[in-house]
Design a protein with these regions (language model features):
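Solvent-exposed, non-membrane alpha-helical residues enriched in polar/charged side chains
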Residues: 4, 12, 16, 40, ...
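Histidine- and aromatic-rich ligand-binding microenvironments
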Residues: 39, 43-44, 49-69, 142
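Short coil/turn segments at alpha/beta junctions that flank glycine-rich nucleotide-binding fingerprints
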Residues: 17-21, 93, 135
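Amphipathic alpha-helical segments used for helix-helix packing
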Residues: 88-109
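Hydrophobic alpha-helical connector segments
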Residues: 52, 56, 66-91, 146
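Helix-turn-helix
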Residues: 6, 10, 14-48, 52
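Hydrophobic alpha-helical segments that form the core
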Residues: 126, 139-146
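Amphipathic alpha-helical packing segments from all-alpha helical-bundle domains
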Residues: 108-135
């Protein structure tokens, strides 16, 4: 395992176990066996590291959804299944669970992280709706409102 991978795995584990606020860059460095300077060659700060994990979660979810989009199911069934899968994915995500706990404990920074996650999901759904409008599978509408 290379240093970056060690840092990423350690940080992910620590964030999931203790939450965003309680984990320090010092702790990540110590636990992963690298210096803080090494961590800062990979990530600008703790926020950018946490956003990396949010993006990682989003990519996992998108890959799962894309598999269904490429199936022979009717469009409406694909949409319903995708929305359900997104909700289940979010419910079962350790990262989102960690963010939710932080928000309950008054960490406003985590509200921003959750907004990034939610905005990305909404943008993704809107993109898929616009694609289906172009294909003629659904009537023209405001995809953002839909």
């Amino acid at each position: 395992m290379d240093k970056k991978e060690a840092v990423i795995n350690t940080a992910r584990d620590l964030f999931q176990k203790y939450g965003y606020k309680k984990v320090s860059m010092d702790e990540i460095a110590k636990t992963s066996g690298v210096t803080k300077k090494t961590i800062y060659t990979y990530f600008k700060d703790k926020d950018s590291m946490f956003l990396y994990f949010i993006e990682e979660e989003l990519q996992k979810m998108k890959r799962k959804i894309e598999k269904k989009n490429n199936s022979d199911l009717p469009f409406i069934e694909v949409v319903a299944t995708n929305l359900y899968d997104m909700l289940i994915f979010r419910k079962n995500s350790m990262l989102i669970s960690t963010i939710s706990k932080e928000i309950k404990n008054g960490n406003d920074k985590c509200c921003d992280f959750l907004k990034v996650y939610d905005d990305e999901i909404l943008s993704y759904i809107e993109e898929k709706i616009n694609l289906e409008i172009k294909k003629g599978n659904i009537k023209k509408c405001d995809a953002h409102l839909t």
